[in-house]
Structure formats: C-alpha cells, structure tokens
Design a protein with these regions (language model features):
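A juxtamembrane structural motif centered on a specific transmembrane helix
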Residues: 1-28, 68-75, 372-375, 406-427
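N-terminal hydrophobic segments of proteins, predominantly signal-anchor/transmembrane helices
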Residues: 22-46, 57-118, 385
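Hydrophobic transmembrane alpha-helices and their immediate junctions
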Residues: 24, 205-206, 245-247, 344-386, ...
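Interfacial loop-to-transmembrane-helix boundary motif in multi-pass membrane proteins
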Residues: 26-29, 81-92, 119-120, 128-159
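Membrane helix-loop boundary segments at the extracytoplasmic
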Residues: 35-50, 339, 343-348, 376-416
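Membrane-interfacial helix-loop-helix modules of multi-pass inner-membrane proteins that assemble, modify
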Residues: 101-108, 138-143, 151-186, 311-323
Length: 427
C-alpha cells in the first residue's frame, strides 16, 4: 500500500469521524426523510398513506428556497445547465396544459394538477437535493452507515426467502421458489431501493465494492429483468471506468449490447406481442401523438397513474381500444403505469417528447459536470432510470424521488470531501 493511499484513507477516516461528531438536528431530519422514502411502499401498504414522495419534494423545495434566502448567493447559483433543465421542464408543462385545452379530452382540473405535479416532482427533487446537501459530509456519513445495515438485513432476508415463505416473496421465476420483495410490496421496489443505495456507495467504490456486490445479489434475487440489466451495466462501469472518470462510446456500446442480450426476450414479449398492455399502450401513444400533432392529449389523459381510477379513466382509452386490453380495463388497470415513454408521447406529443428528452439530458449533463469524484454515481443513477423507463413509470415513479435524494447526498458529500482535503493540505 502506497503512502498516498494511506494518507487518503487517513483523511477519509478523519473526515467521517468529524462528520459524525458534528451531526445536527437538520441532518437527523434528512435521515428520517431518507427512511420514509426508502420504506414508502411499506408505509403505503400498511397505513394507506401514499404521499411521502410528494411531501418530500415539497419539503426539499421549500428548504432550498429558505437556504437561498438565508445564504443569498453564497450557497446557490443557477448555472446554464440547470436553467436549461428548468426551462425545458416548464416547456413540457406548457405543452401539456395546451394539449388539455386543444385536444378537448374531458379531464377534471384536479387530475390535471395532480398529474402536472407528478411530471415535475423528480426533476425538482434532483435539483433541490443537489443544492440542499451542499458540502454536507455529515448526512452522507449517516446514510452510508445505514445503507450498509439495510443491505445486510435485506441480503439475509433474500436468501431466507429462497428457502422459506415468511411474507417477503413474490411469484417464482427461472425455477426458483419465489422472487424477493422484502417489505416493499413488489420486487421492482426492491430493485429501485437497492439502486439508490448503490448510487450512494458508488462514490467510494473501492472501499464499498463488497457492499455494492451484496446489493447486486439482492437485486438478482428479485428475478427482474431490469435488475439483471442494471447489474450488468454497473459491472461494466465498475470494471472499466478508470480513475480519469471518462465515459466513452465503448462504455455505451458494451452496456447496450449487454442490455439487449439480457432484456431481449422480455422486450419481445411485452412490446412485440399483440394484445399485451405495454405493446398496446405504445401503439396507442404513437397514434395519439400523430392524431393530435404537434401536441398530445394533455395531462391526465394517457398512461399516467391518476387515470387508473375508474372515476378518472381517460376517454382516450375507449377511443383507442385500450379499454379492451387485459390489465387496462376499467377497474382492472394493474398494468396502466408499466410504461414511461408512451405516457410522455401520448400526453405531450412529439414536441413534448423532445422537450422531455432534452430536459433529462440537461439534468444528466448538469450532474455529471458538477460531480468530480462521484461521476460513477451519476452514471448509475441515470442508467437505472433509463432501464426502468422500459418497464415502469421511471421519472414519474415514487421511488425516483428516493433515487434523486440518494444522488444529491452522494455528490454533495464528494464536494465536501474535496473542500476538506484542500484545507488539510493547506495545513
């Protein structure tokens, strides 16, 4: 072990010890929010309360505003990339509202408001989490310790689930007794939760490699295709992503090949088989975007969670034959939110689709440019969201707020460490 490595490890240990000693009540509060977001599905299934992610976004937003007012320009400055992200997001909102007016599809104003907030909550959470955790090594130290504790508990439970039925299993696949859902209600929630933990741990991949590997085992035991693709993506990045932190076309090519190989069967089944929910939603979305060109149907008209209720069931589902598809019929809409891009295309049209893609690209560029030392966390975060967008509501999903929360913590801690390293060297 070189002297430089020993020195770096010593600095890291000193910083973490100091961080724990300097823990504030606000840090404990953010840790509570971290837990509420992680266990949101358990809270929803147990107590029927389903607004934790929305409340977390509002709390993040008002905390950011308060910090901006209190610190003025010393803590928060809006750069070109985040401004572009917000401008494009605002454009999507305008396009969606214009679509509601022009398309003439009958929807209630309250549903439009709910769907609009669903559209903006994750991008807002990303930006606010970045600014609110500015230079905060304390919260990251606390969250990293808890992340490792959660991984141990989940791994033991996942292995036991292979042998015994004790309420943490879902349907079996690939010859195994059952897939793992922990206390989160569905295996896909476990994949998202572990992805968030990996994003946090990835900023220090050398020290946390074993913990990340355990998280990948948990993801694998959910038996979900998106989980396998995410594991392959993470493995490629962990093996090939060097110290210079350069993401190249070769990385993208390797990830695309692995993703295609691992997800091909599921893609063919869901998107190329006539009569499946995802296939029919995709075809209907394209038709809607063409019929209502240049806009779409507007908010709360197609594919969004708010339209799953019988009272809010969209007239477009009858018009485009969606109401006759198993899993999409009135009162039986269990597969209605299993897509993301068809919802964007159907509700916002081709122009709105371009705006939304641009917004995501700007968000990624913003985080990647501001995350020296944590670029791997950024890549894993957006890779997971892109992978999940093929089979769930991705950026509209409640767990996406948890992912945004996790990335904000990972990046802010890295920046804090850089500042402290500079101070250490000056001494």
């Amino acid at each position: 072990m070189s002297l430089a490595t020993v020195d770096a490890n010593y600095r890291s240990a000193v910083q973490r010890s100091t961080a724990f000693l300097e823990t504030r009540m606000s840090d404990v509060g953010w840790l509570v929010w971290f837990n509420l977001l992680f266990f949101e599905m358990w809270v929803q299934n147990t107590f029927g309360f389903s607004y934790i992610d929305e409340l977390a976004v509002l709390f993040l937003f008002f905390a950011t505003v308060f910090k901006a007012v209190r610190m003025r320009k010393r803590a928060i400055t809006i750069g070109s990339l985040e401004k572009r992200s917000l401008d494009l997001l605002f454009g999507v909102c305008i396009i969606g509202l214009a679509g509601n007016v022009i398309s003439g599809v009958s929807v209630s104003p309250s549903n439009v408001a709910v769907d609009l907030f669903t559209c903006i909550k994750t991008p807002i959470a990303f930006i606010c989490a970045y600014f609110i955790f500015y230079d905060n090594q304390r919260i990251e130290s606390m969250v990293e310790v808890e992340s490792k504790f959660l991984i141990v508990i989940m791994l033991v439970s996942a292995v036991m689930n292979l042998l015994f039925d004790f309420g943490m299993g879902w349907e079996g696949r690939y010859g195994l007794r059952s897939s793992f859902c922990f206390v989160l209600g569905h295996p896909t929630m476990v994949v998202a939760a572990c992805a968030g933990l990996v994003v946090i741990l990835a900023r220090n991949r050398q020290d946390n490699f074993a913990w990340m590997s355990m998280a990948f085992v948990i993801i694998a035991l959910t038996l979900r295709s998106k989980g396998f693709v995410f594991i392959a993506t993470a493995a490629i990045l962990l093996i090939t992503y060097g110290r210079h932190e350069k993401f190249t076309f070769l990385h993208l090519l390797l990830i695309a090949v692995c993703g295609f190989y691992l997800g091909y069967d599921q893609f063919i089944y869901y998107f190329s088989t006539e009569g499946t929910a995802r296939n029919e939603l995709t075809k209907a979305a394209v038709r809607i975007a063409n019929d209502f060109f240049p806009l779409g149907g507007g908010f709360a008209t197609f594919g969004s969670a708010v339209t799953a209720n019988v009272a809010s069931y969209s007239p477009l589902y009858y018009q485009y034959g969606i109401s006759n598809i198993w899993g999409l019929t009135p009162g039986q809409t269990m597969f209605l939110s299993d897509t993301f891009w068809p919802t964007v295309i159907g509700q916002f049209g081709w122009i709105g689709f371009a705006f939304y893609v641009g917004m995501i690209g700007s968000l990624f560029a913003f985080f990647y440019s501001r995350s020296s030392g944590a670029k791997l966390s950024v890549l894993l975060c957006f890779a997971y969201l892109f992978i999940s967008s093929t089979s769930e509501s991705a950026f509209f999903h409640p767990m996406s707020v948890f992912i945004a929360f996790s990335l904000g913590i990972a990046i802010a801690a890295t920046r804090s460490a850089q500042v402290q390293n500079c101070e250490y060297e000056d001494k």
